[in-house]
Amino acid sequence: MTWLPLNPIPLKDRVSMIFLQYGQIDVIDGAFVLIDKTGIRTHIPVGSVACIMLEPGTRVSHAAVRLAAQVGTLLVWVGEAGVRVYASGQPGGARSDKLLYQAKLALDEDLRLKVVRKMFELRFGEPAPARRSVEQLRGIEGSRVRATYALLAKQYGVTWNGRRYDPKDWEKGDTINQCISAATSCLYGVTEAAILAAGYAPAIGFVHTGKPLSFVYDIADIIKFDTVVPKAFEIARRNPGEPDREVRLACRDIFRSSKTLAKLIPLIEDVLAAGEIQPPAPPEDAQPVAIPLPVSLGDAGHRSS
């Protein structure tokens, strides 16, 4: 019989991510394990991880997917080095009230503009220019992003020829583009886990639209130049033999030291609140969020259970 905790571990208290490759993922004696070709088992603490990135060479059993869903852990099927996302398994947190709230903000042009302006302000530390449309703000953002990449390249002494990479061919990109791709992939994974845990839809974006992870890109872009992208340039400067591995380890440390997972859901709520509309109350029979926060006693002298 599979043992499960009474409540999933809150997202903010979890390890950010784990990358797995070349093995069969299954549940044996109640444990989530990776079995390699020689039969060696590696235990994976599935309930204490925000998302598990599954690289080429992995096969996942029904029991493993079921256990991951029960403990609120996101499974993401990615390409080599995590530079391409093929699919993800939602851990069961989406709710109609949250989705309708998000969709209303995205479908109303005035509300959408308010949200985009808030994203701009959070990303660049200053209010968005007045009387600009979403398309115009997107253009201003793109120009600033290109300038930021060039500035980081100069700061770290890295040759920069622009953001150029082929997601179908990892080896084709130069070292800096490989590092950036690996870093942003890590950030996208934990951001998607946070969005799903909060009950929202990764596909309903505001700046980005028409992609399965549009909202993921929106939220991740707010913090990527304060977290993972500078580290990608720092690692690329050393020209390591395994840039993707070094970047992943560095990102994991950044997420832990900066408490990224603890900040993501409040950031998501702050961005959506810019629309200045009241979120609908959940129905009485609404499904609870995938990873609920522990109930506090309301006394600073007591710890929540």
UniProtKB/Swiss-Prot annotation:
One of its GO terms (cellular component) is cytoplasm. Disruption phenotype: Not essential. Increased sensitivity to MMC and UV light; double ygbT-ruvA, ruvB or ruvC disruptions have no further phenotype suggesting Cas1 functions in the same DNA repair pathway. Function in DNA repair also seems to require CRISPRs. Cells elongate after 2 hours growth in MMC; they are even longer in double ygbT-ruvA, ruvB or ruvC disruptions, suggesting Cas1 may also function in chromosome segregation. Loss of plasmid silencing. Its EC number is 3.1.-.-. Changing I291 to G/R: No effect on spacer acquisition. It is found in: Cytoplasm. One of its GO terms (biological process) is maintenance of CRISPR repeat elements. Changing Y188A: Partial inhibition of cleavage. No effect on in vitro protospacer integration. Significantly decreased protospacer acquisition in vivo. CRISPR (clustered regularly interspaced short palindromic repeat), is an adaptive immune system that provides protection against mobile genetic elements (viruses, transposable elements and conjugative plasmids). CRISPR clusters contain sequences complementary to antecedent mobile elements and target invading nucleic acids. CRISPR clusters are transcribed and processed into CRISPR RNA (crRNA). The Cas1-Cas2 complex is involved in CRISPR adaptation, the first stage of CRISPR immunity, being required for the addition/removal of CRISPR spacers at the leader end of the CRISPR locus. InterPro entries: Cas1, Cas1_I-E, CRISPR-assoc_Cas1, CRISPR-assoc_Cas1_C, CRISPR-assoc_Cas1_ECOLI, CRISPR-assoc_Cas1_N. Residues 278-305 are annotated as: Disordered. Homodimer. Part of the Cas1-Cas2 complex. Interacts with RecB, RecC, RuvB, CasC and CasE. Forms a hexamer with 2 Cas1 dimers sandwiching a Cas2 dimer. The DNA lies across a flat surface extending from 1 Cas1 dimer, across the Cas2 dimer and contacting the other Cas1 dimer. Only 1 Cas1 protein from each dimer is catalytic, the other interacts with the Cas2 dimer and possibly target DNA. Changing R252E: Loss of spacer acquisition, no Cas1-Cas2 complex formation, loss of CRISPR DNA-binding by complex. Protein is stable and dimerizes. One of its GO terms (molecular function) is endonuclease activity. The keyword DNA damage applies. Changing R248E: Dramatically decreased spacer acquisition in vivo. This is CRISPR-associated endonuclease Cas1. Changing R59A: Loss of spacer acquisition in vivo, decreased protospacer binding. Its main location: cytoplasm. Changing R245D: Decreased spacer acquisition. It comes from Escherichia coli (strain K12). Nuclease activity partially inhibited by CasE. Residues 96-278 are annotated as: Sufficient for cleavage of ssRNA, ssDNA and Holliday junction DNA. Signal peptide: none annotated. Changing R41E: Dramatically decreased spacer acquisition in vivo.
